[in-house]
C-alpha cells in the first residue's frame, strides 16, 4: 500500500525555511523603517532651514518692514540681532511649522519643533530652535541654531541674517 503525504522531516524542513525567511524579512524591514524615519526627519530639517534662510533673505531684498509668513504669521525684518528679538522670531517660526501640521516621523507625541536652550527634551525626530551667540571675534549679536536629532545624527545648522554677527 502506497501512502501519500509528507514525512515529518519534510514538514520540519519547510517550517525551518519559512522561519529563516521571516527572520531575514523582519531585520530588513526594521532597517528600512529606521532609514525612512531618518530620511523624513532630515528632509523636514532641510525644509525648515531653507525656509528660514529664504525668508531672512527676503527681508534684505524688500529692505526691511514686515514679512508675512502666512495668513496668521509675520515678523519684523528690522529686528536687531539680540537674543530677545531672535527668541521672538523663533516662536513665530515654531508656530508656522506647527501650523503646517508637521509630525515627528519617529511617532513621538511631542511637537516636531520646539524652542529650548538645552538638549534635555531632544528626542529622535525633533528639531530644537534656539538663539546662540555669534562666534569669537564678534562683539555683539546672536543667531539662530536649528538642531536636529535622529537615531544617527545630532547637530545644529546655524542661521543668521546679514549684519547680525558683526564687530
Task: Please give the residue ranges for each predicted region.
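N-terminal single-pass transmembrane signal-anchor helix
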Residues: 2-33
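Generic N-terminal initiation segments characterized by hydrophobic and/or small/turn-forming residues
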Residues: 5-9, 18, 48, 86, ...
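Membrane-proximal N-terminal amphipathic helix
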Residues: 34-64
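Periplasmic/extracellular, small/polar-rich flexible segments of pilin-like filament-forming proteins
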Residues: 57-167
Amino acid at each position: 500500500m502506497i501512502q501519500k503525504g509528507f514525512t515529518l522531516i519534510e514538514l520540519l524542513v519547510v517550517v525551518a525555511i519559512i522561519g529563516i525567511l521571516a527572520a531575514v524579512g523582519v531585520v530588513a524591514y526594521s532597517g528600512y523603517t529606521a532609514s525612512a524615519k531618518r530620511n523624513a526627519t532630515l528632509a523636514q530639517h532641510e525644509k525648515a532651514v531653507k525656509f528660514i534662510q529664504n525668508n531672512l533673505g527676503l527681508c534684505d531684498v524688500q529692505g526691511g518692514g514686515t514679512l508675512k509668513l502666512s495668513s496668521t504669521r509675520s515678523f519684523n525684518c528690522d529686528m536687531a540681532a539680540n537674543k530677545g528679538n531672535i527668541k521672538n522670531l523663533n516662536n513665530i517660526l515654531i508656530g508656522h511649522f506647527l501650523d503646517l501640521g508637521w509630525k515627528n516621523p519617529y511617532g513621538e507625541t511631542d511637537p516636531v519643533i520646539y524652542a529650548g536652550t538645552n538638549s534635555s527634551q531632544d528626542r529622535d525626530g525633533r528639531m530644537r530652535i534656539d538663539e546662540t551667540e555669534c562666534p569669537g571675534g564678534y562683539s555683539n549679536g546672536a543667531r539662530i541654531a536649528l538642531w536636529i536629532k535622529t537615531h544617527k545624527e545630532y547637530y545644529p545648522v546655524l542661521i543668521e541674517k546679514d549684519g547680525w554677527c558683526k564687530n
